[in-house]
Curated annotation (Swiss-Prot):
Stored InterPro entries: Toxic_anion-R_TelA
Protein name as catalogued: Uncharacterized protein Lmo1967
Homology family: Belongs to the TelA family.
Species in which this protein is naturally found: Listeria monocytogenes serovar 1/2a (strain ATCC BAA-679 / EGD-e)
Pfam families: TelA (PF05816)
Xref: PANTHER family: TELA-LIKE PROTEIN SAOUHSC_01408
Length: 399
């Protein structure tokens, strides 16, 4: 337990750093739309735009206002600013994806599976048959110590119980860590939602600016150029067209980033659900299965002690019968009646076997869930690596 403290503290520190890194509001993500101080950019919709519904029409009224204000900051004359448009949100999304990948990589629940396997091994050490003592050989066990005595059996089960308690403590720590991970993932989910909303506003603002250029600015410039015949006026038309094309490509890149946030949401939930299912199974083992096992073993040991007492009483009766032959008939009758009475209440150990079998099935199901969770996380890790690489390629293409 002590050896795990440094690693646990390191993980907690990493979580705090990541939490601080992503502790930004939607307004923060929109505060610097072009990725640098004092710089603005411009955007435009391509003339060959599809008839797909505008993203701005899907926004809330508040977000529509933000998109409109942001579109006003886009200056068609500032060609260089296009490279930085939406870059802050994309950069944070890149860091977020990297954080998600790091989280999936460090979430190896293998130790939990090892702990559960250890628990199953300890439970299987408990042999219900050695608690039954149904035949007469039990008296030989008790008095001649040919086999285990009641004290040896009790000592064995006390040792197993202590080991199970230690395993239960480890499982409790593992469950706590899983729930802490889910809490951290919930924070990541909320931040992913913020990035999604910020990208929506960036894209919507770009759509609005493109629409303005296509429907108003370009027609006006073309009309002016046709009226004046000035080559510089025609150049302005060409510059604005080129600006619109670059902005349209930039908006497309932002749409790709937006798709990443859409895909990450169910992936986060998938990891959370797997953690929750595993934590629930651990809770079932700690709160139900282990106490039930202890209770049944305690009952079986108590009954075994009762059998020992019955055996001792019978031996006394038989010894007395040998020594007191003058009272043989009476002692014989008493011994038989006493034996009959004391033989009552011998426990049916089948119930204990069935209970232990159910417990082992529960643990096997837990291992199955753990294995499925590991496979799902491996798939999620591969997908996140692919998405991160795609994002890097997109960002490189923008340069």
């Amino acid at each position: 337990m002590t050896e795990n403290k440094p690693s646990e503290q390191t993980n907690e520190l990493k979580d705090l750093v990541v939490e601080k890194e992503f502790n930004q509001t939607l307004d923060d993500l929109l505060a610097n739309p072009f990725g640098s101080d004092g710089e603005s950019a411009a955007s435009i919709v391509n003339n060959e735009t599809d008839a797909a519904p505008r993203l701005v029409d899907m926004l809330t009224e508040t977000n529509k206002k933000q998109a409109l204000e942001l579109s006003k900051q886009i200056e068609p004359g500032n060609q260089a600013a296009i490279l930085g448009y939406g870059a802050p949100a994309q950069a944070k999304l890149h860091d977020f994806s990297h954080s998600m990948l790091a989280h999936v990589q460090k979430q190896d629940v293998g130790p939990i599976g090892d702990i559960i396997s250890d628990l199953m091994y300890r439970l299987q050490e408990a042999d219900p048959d050695e608690l039954a003592a149904r035949n007469k050989n039990v008296f030989t066990k008790m008095f001649h110590r040919v086999k285990q005595s009641i004290n040896e059996i009790t000592s064995k089960y006390q040792k197993i119980g202590t080991q199970i308690d230690r395993i239960a403590l480890k499982l409790e720590h593992s469950k706590k860590r899983l729930m802490e991970d889910n809490s951290f993932l919930e924070q990541l989910y909320d931040k992913n939602k913020d990035y999604f909303q910020a990208l929506n506003i960036y894209i919507a603002a770009g759509e609005l600016k493109l629409e303005e250029i296509n429907t108003k600015m370009l027609p006006e410039l073309r009309k002016k150029a046709e009226q004046t015949g000035d080559q510089m006026d025609y150049q302005e038309v060409n510059d604005l067209t080129q600006f619109a094309d670059r902005l349209d490509k930039r908006v497309y890149d932002l749409r790709l980033s937006r798709q990443i946030t859409i895909q990450q949401a169910p992936q986060i939930r998938l990891i959370q659900n797997t953690n929750q299912a595993l934590a629930e199974k651990i809770q079932s083992s700690i709160m139900t299965a282990i106490p039930l096992w202890k209770n049944q073993v305690a009952i079986a040991l108590t009954l075994l002690r009762q059998q020992q007492a019955v055996a001792a009483q019978r031996q006394v009766s038989e010894t007395t019968n040998e020594l007191l032959k003058r009272n043989a008939d009476m002692l014989k009758t008493n011994a038989i009646e006493t034996a009959r009475e004391n033989e009552r209440g011998i426990v049916d150990i089948e119930t204990l076997k069935e209970t232990q079998s159910s417990l082992i099935e529960t643990l096997q199901e837990t291992l199955k869930i753990q294995q499925e969770g590991r496979a799902k996380r491996a798939v999620a890790e591969k997908e996140l690596v692919t998405m991160e690489q795609e994002l890097k390629e997109r960002l490189l293409e923008m340069k």
